Amino acid sequence: MKTDAIELGVAKDSTPIGGANRGVSILDFILRLVALVGTLASAILMGTTNETLPFATQFIRFRAEYDDLPTFTFFVVANIVVSGYLLLSLPLSIVNIVRSTAKNRRIILIIFDTAMLALLTAGASAAAAIVYLAHKGNTRANWFAICQQFNSFCERISGSLIGSFVGVAVFILLILMSASALSRRN
């Protein structure tokens, strides 16, 4: 009797595929919320970053703002676009919880998740390179580190990278989970 069950692939203790996919869909929704909070916080933190040095003269003021560098502007725009996508994908994720056997919706999410992963990775990596230069400088190119003077500015731009890279990690997990759920269905 047991050999027949093994040969047919039927087991009494196995979980139904719909139940496992529902759990994946719930985790998908939670991870999307985590990524939304991280990317939105990163965009807000970077977008509101500025610092003016206290020893400004009558004619010269030393000020650092995020939009002084196009890389930081790209970082903010990339995080806002990804946050908007995550907000718009939440209803689709809820539909996947209710109807966990929806293959087409999951494929659409994988495609757009991959595009958003690429955008977010590009923005976070470019900003990380500039943050590194702000902290360390580059003596060969005569780029001096500015973080000794603009301490608060550097702390904020460094902190804004954390949420963005958390978003990158979450997108990788989302893509792997969705691909795994699709492969179990076939």
UniProtKB/Swiss-Prot annotation:
<keyword id="KW-0325">Glycoprotein</keyword>
<feature type="transmembrane region" description="Helical">
    <location>
        <begin position="74"/>
        <end position="94"/>
    </location>
</feature>
<feature type="topological domain" description="Cytoplasmic">
    <location>
        <begin position="95"/>
        <end position="106"/>
    </location>
</feature>
<comment type="subunit">
    <text>Homodimer and heterodimers.</text>
</comment>
<dbReference type="Pfam" id="PF04535">
    <property type="entry name" value="CASP_dom"/>
</dbReference>
<comment type="similarity">
    <text>Belongs to the Casparian strip membrane proteins (CASP) family.</text>
</comment>
<keyword id="KW-0812">Transmembrane</keyword>
<feature type="transmembrane region" description="Helical">
    <location>
        <begin position="157"/>
        <end position="177"/>
    </location>
</feature>
<feature type="transmembrane region" description="Helical">
    <location>
        <begin position="26"/>
        <end position="46"/>
    </location>
</feature>
<keyword id="KW-1003">Cell membrane</keyword>
<keyword id="KW-0472">Membrane</keyword>
<feature type="glycosylation site" description="N-linked (GlcNAc...) asparagine">
    <location>
        <position position="50"/>
    </location>
</feature>
<feature type="topological domain" description="Extracellular">
    <location>
        <begin position="47"/>
        <end position="73"/>
    </location>
</feature>
<dbReference type="InterPro" id="IPR006459">
    <property type="entry name" value="CASP/CASPL"/>
</dbReference>
<dbReference type="GO" id="GO:0042545">
    <property type="term" value="P:cell wall modification"/>
</dbReference>
<protein>
    <recommendedName>
        <fullName>Casparian strip membrane protein 5</fullName>
    </recommendedName>
</protein>
<dbReference type="GO" id="GO:0005886">
    <property type="term" value="C:plasma membrane"/>
</dbReference>
<feature type="topological domain" description="Cytoplasmic">
    <location>
        <begin position="1"/>
        <end position="25"/>
    </location>
</feature>
<dbReference type="InterPro" id="IPR006702">
    <property type="entry name" value="CASP_dom"/>
</dbReference>
<keyword id="KW-1133">Transmembrane helix</keyword>
<dbReference type="GO" id="GO:0007043">
    <property type="term" value="P:cell-cell junction assembly"/>
</dbReference>
<feature type="topological domain" description="Cytoplasmic">
    <location>
        <begin position="178"/>
        <end position="186"/>
    </location>
</feature>
<dbReference type="InterPro" id="IPR044173">
    <property type="entry name" value="CASPL"/>
</dbReference>
<comment type="function">
    <text>Regulates membrane-cell wall junctions and localized cell wall deposition. Required for establishment of the Casparian strip membrane domain (CSD) and the subsequent formation of Casparian strips, a cell wall modification of the root endodermis that determines an apoplastic barrier between the intraorganismal apoplasm and the extraorganismal apoplasm and prevents lateral diffusion.</text>
</comment>
<keyword id="KW-0961">Cell wall biogenesis/degradation</keyword>
<feature type="transmembrane region" description="Helical">
    <location>
        <begin position="107"/>
        <end position="127"/>
    </location>
</feature>
<feature type="topological domain" description="Extracellular">
    <location>
        <begin position="128"/>
        <end position="156"/>
    </location>
</feature>
